[in-house]
Amino acid sequence: MREIVHIQIGQCGNQIGAKFWEMIGEEHGIDLAGSDRGASALQLERISVYYNEAYGRKYVPRAVLVDLEPGTMDSIRSSKLGALFQPDSFVHGNSGAGNNWAKGHYTEGAELIENVLEVVRHESESCDCLQGFQIVHSLGGGTGSGMGTLLMNKIREEYPDRIMNSFSVMPSPKVSDTVVEPYNAVLSIHQLIENADACFCIDNEALYDICFRTLKLTTPTYGDLNHLVSLTMSGITTSLRFPGQLNADLRKLAVNMVPFPRLHFFMPGFAPLTAQGSQQYRALSVAELTQQMFDARNTMAACDLRRGRYLTVACIFRGKMSTKEVDQQLLSVQTRNSSCFVEWIPNNVKVAVCDIPPRGLSMAATFIGNNTAIQEIFNRVSEHFSAMFKRKAFVHWYTSEGMDINEFGEAENNIHDLVSEYQQFQDAKAVLEEDEEVTEEAEMEPEDKGH
């Protein structure tokens, strides 16, 4: 079976990761002790993608849990999930990274990295045919961002032909924990551009907006935000975990979603959005799901979708529904909003349908969009970065860990390049909207692309 090794790193990564295992455990009928309590054979058909079967039919997550301080690990160990993971899967330091990317990437993280790679190798060796890795981390702190990207580089060196996916939580000024978040984020994105195959960008600002506007929560906690993220992660990985038709492995997902190697940053979305512990009172129709799924308010990345255009889209519908109706609804979205999809990638919306809905819902849909509007997130972070870097504020914390100041400039330039690449493809053939001669334009396109 095509296995995936899951790595959660840093406080944020570990908290979201724990939620993810709780949620997919419920979907596959695996209880907190790792035993099978499922009602359907489908639940176990592809269980080996994320779980190892140990003695006595106990299922153990293929997970590596990493942090530079013991706190989050201890709380996972003592939580209800504690007995699920293999004790060797926990790797932690004691000093912490102090929200400093350079500590995670060059000093503290570098000291621990060999221990982590040992566990990663051990997990990879127990796979029949490893398809790739997924890393869950945040970009605002020190460990998830600095050590997370270091780990990705090392795994890339050792497993160059395996797919590397990341679920990356982007910092936002509204939900800021530390002043140096823009530094940590830009330095991380600089690495992700080069070393990830697919990056699901989860933006704290968008998660807060969903909690306030849609779920009407007055004081959202990190638990509420993590619940939204785990819904999305469970949705995105559905076609990997259950027998389905489309994007059944990480490589196919990347091939369908990434038209140019650097443009691999996706915005996930989910419908229907429900708060933790709440029940949904009425089932939505396929039309309502489709409409909600494409609605910017349901997207986990805070940017204005009306300004951008979709390069590619993948949708995963879950529950008992007619595939024909799903296809019709998606077609009508594309015809009604044709200007939102680039016309030079025909059939750029892919869809999968899986019979098994998420727990507590009768139907749900997950959305993965590669939209040029994501440049707004990078712009936002890089503006804050530049404002501080002009004055060299806080830079001594990084250089004192042995980091070269030139790396800041390189990272800043790389992100500016990424933003202008998104802009270039957003504008490509924008003439079409005024011009009716669509077919002639399309025939001329290959020559236009040349220069």
From Swiss-Prot:
Q: Which gene does this sequence derive from?
A: TUBB1
Q: Phosphoserine occurs at which residues?
A: 172
Question: Binding of GTP: at which residues?
Answer: 11, 69, 138, 142-144, 204, 226
Q: Where is this motif: MREI motif?
A: 1-4
Q: Name one Pfam family in it.
A: Tubulin_C
Q: What is known of its domains?
A: The MREI motif is common among all beta-tubulin isoforms and may be critical for tubulin autoregulation.
Entry-linked PROSITE patterns: TUBULIN, TUBULIN_B_AUTOREG
Compartment(s) where it occurs, according to its Swiss-Prot or TrEMBL record: Cytoplasm, Cytoskeleton
GO BP annotation list: microtubule cytoskeleton organization; microtubule polymerization; mitotic cell cycle; platelet aggregation; platelet formation; spindle assembly; thyroid gland development; thyroid hormone transport
Family indicated by similarity: Belongs to the tubulin family.
Please list where the region (Disordered) is annotated: 432-451
What cofactor is needed?
Mg(2+)
> Does the UniProt entry include the keyword Cell division?
no
Query: What is the tissue specificity?
Result: Hematopoietic cell-specific. Major isotype in leukocytes, where it represents 50% of all beta-tubulins.
Q: How does it assemble?
A: Dimer of alpha and beta chains. A typical microtubule is a hollow water-filled tube with an outer diameter of 25 nm and an inner diameter of 15 nM. Alpha-beta heterodimers associate head-to-tail to form protofilaments running lengthwise along the microtubule wall with the beta-tubulin subunit facing the microtubule plus end conferring a structural polarity. Microtubules usually have 13 protofilaments but different protofilament numbers can be found in some organisms and specialized cells. Interacts with RANBP10.
Would you indicate the residue range of the signal peptide? Answer: none
Please classify the protein's predominant subcellular localization into one broad category. cytoplasm
What is the protein named? Tubulin beta-1 chain
Q: How is it modified after translation?
A: Some glutamate residues at the C-terminus are polyglutamylated, resulting in polyglutamate chains on the gamma-carboxyl group. Polyglutamylation plays a key role in microtubule severing by spastin (SPAST). SPAST preferentially recognizes and acts on microtubules decorated with short polyglutamate tails: severing activity by SPAST increases as the number of glutamates per tubulin rises from one to eight, but decreases beyond this glutamylation threshold. Glutamylation is also involved in cilia motility. Some glutamate residues at the C-terminus are monoglycylated but not polyglycylated due to the absence of functional TTLL10 in human. Monoglycylation is mainly limited to tubulin incorporated into cilia and flagella axonemes, which is required for their stability and maintenance. Flagella glycylation controls sperm motility. Both polyglutamylation and monoglycylation can coexist on the same protein on adjacent residues, and lowering glycylation levels increases polyglutamylation, and reciprocally.
